[in-house]
């Protein structure tokens, strides 16, 4: 790809410059798509918490908090864009340890809500709930990218595969213990995508797939009863319409009720559980219709395309893998989240990036986008 070109530039002694001219490399399309998707998320937060329920607007309103998190995300985006992304490569292991500490802390003092009330997924700080597993997704993209970038010359070695699996193991197990099946699947999918795009041996990727299959009994044993029921009813939600199949049935009803143009913002009538997070696309389809739902999917397609363009244009392995990892992570979450709503995949609790309510998710995504913009600004290229 572009790795040999990067090595040639370094041998010639050329170093990237991050001056004002570098801003012509800023990917404004990428940021625009992310902002538009976040705007859809704000609209859904308003509809779910203010418009349809007529709640008073207070500091504790999810809509107001979504705006606050949006402002914080913009600041994080600007800061991470300004910093040289290369420090992340040397700081990846401290980040990994911080990630482990946060996940252990979640198990120790975490709280759960709703159906998953026995799960320890959120840590309450100053009245705000933080889901550190959302941060773990982005941190692990950085860690995987740094690990594989350092081993590009031996990427086909089985020891490289074994090593990165050992890196995945601790956070994956800690997330599964919460239990958070959705995030554990995202971590595995992200790593698999990165291994494939970094040129790992297909033989060893097949071995990795076999390992994942072999781990299914362990994963099943760690799942809560309601999670197992969700999987067992995916083929026929009407087998338990008031229990495990209720969410899928309501989501499909909402999508069908929206029609082509939707019922209008705040006019949704179908009751959906976790309507601001896991099933937000169902609410969006009901209120904004098929047109609105498709527009969101088109925006995601364009966003992922720009991420892949960033990866293609990167001139060194770490930057390339960062972009590819984030593209893989977002793609997997979108496919599974929409699949949950229309009943094609089990309900696993995976949010819709940028659109689902959640401060930790939005801020971590903003940090990821800012880091990718930093790679664009500092792209190694000769001066003509």
Predicted regions and their residues:
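N-terminal transmembrane signal-anchor/hairpin module of polytopic inner-membrane proteins
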Residues: 1-45, 67
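A juxtamembrane structural motif centered on a specific transmembrane helix
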Residues: 1-17, 338-384
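Hydrophobic alpha-helical transmembrane segments of multi-pass inner membrane proteins, especially
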Residues: 31-47, 52-244, 282-342, 367-371
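Transmembrane helix boundary and interhelical junction motifs in multipass membrane proteins
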Residues: 180-185, 261-264, 275-277, 290-294, ...
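Long extracytoplasmic/lumenal interhelical loops at the membrane interface
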Residues: 255-291, 314, 318
């Amino acid at each position: 790809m572009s790795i040999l070109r990067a090595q040639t530039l370094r041998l010639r002694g050329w170093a990237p410059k991050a001056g004002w001219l570098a801003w012509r490399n800023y990917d404004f399309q990428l940021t625009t798509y992310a902002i538009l998707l976040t705007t859809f998320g704000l609209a859904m937060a308003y509809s779910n918490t203010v418009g349809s329920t007529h709640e008073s607007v207070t500091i504790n309103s999810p809509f107001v908090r979504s705006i606050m998190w949006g402002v914080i995300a913009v600041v994080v985006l600007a800061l991470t864009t300004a910093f040289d992304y290369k420090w992340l490569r040397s700081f990846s292991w401290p980040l990994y340890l911080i990630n482990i500490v946060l996940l252990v802390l979640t198990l120790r003092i975490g709280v759960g809500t709703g159906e998953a009330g026995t799960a320890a997924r959120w840590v309450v700080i100053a009245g705000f709930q933080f889901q550190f597993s959302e941060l773990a997704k982005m941190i692990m993209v950085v860690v995987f990218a740094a690990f594989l970038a350092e081993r590009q010359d031996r990427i086909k070695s089985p020891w490289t595969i074994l090593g990165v699996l050992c890196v995945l193991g601790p956070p994956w197990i800690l997330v599964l213990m919460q239990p958070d099946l959705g995030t554990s699947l995202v971590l595995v999918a992200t790593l698999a995508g990165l291994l494939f795009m970094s040129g790992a041996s297909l033989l060893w990727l097949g071995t990795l797939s076999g390992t994942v299959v072999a781990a299914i009994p362990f994963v099943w044993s760690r799942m809560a009863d309601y999670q197992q029921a969700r999987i067992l009813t995916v083929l026929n939600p009407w087998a338990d319409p008031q229990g495990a199949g209720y969410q899928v049935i309501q989501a499909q009803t909402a999508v069908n009720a929206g029609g082509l143009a939707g019922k209008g913002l705040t006019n949704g009538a179908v009751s959906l559980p976790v309507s601001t997070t896991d099933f937000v696309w169902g609410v969006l389809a009901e209120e904004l219709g098929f047109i609105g739902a498709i527009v969101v999917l088109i925006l995601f397609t364009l966003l992922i395309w720009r991420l892949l363009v960033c990866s293609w244009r990167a001139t060194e392995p770490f930057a390339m893998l960062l972009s590819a990892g984030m593209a893989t992570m977002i793609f997997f979450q979108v496919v599974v989240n929409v699949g949950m709503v229309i009943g094609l995949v089990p309900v696993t609790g995976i949010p819709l990036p940028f659109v689902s309510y959640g401060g930790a998710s939005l801020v971590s995504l903003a940090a990821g986008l800012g880091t990718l913009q930093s790679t664009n600004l500092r792209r190694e290229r000769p001066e003509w």
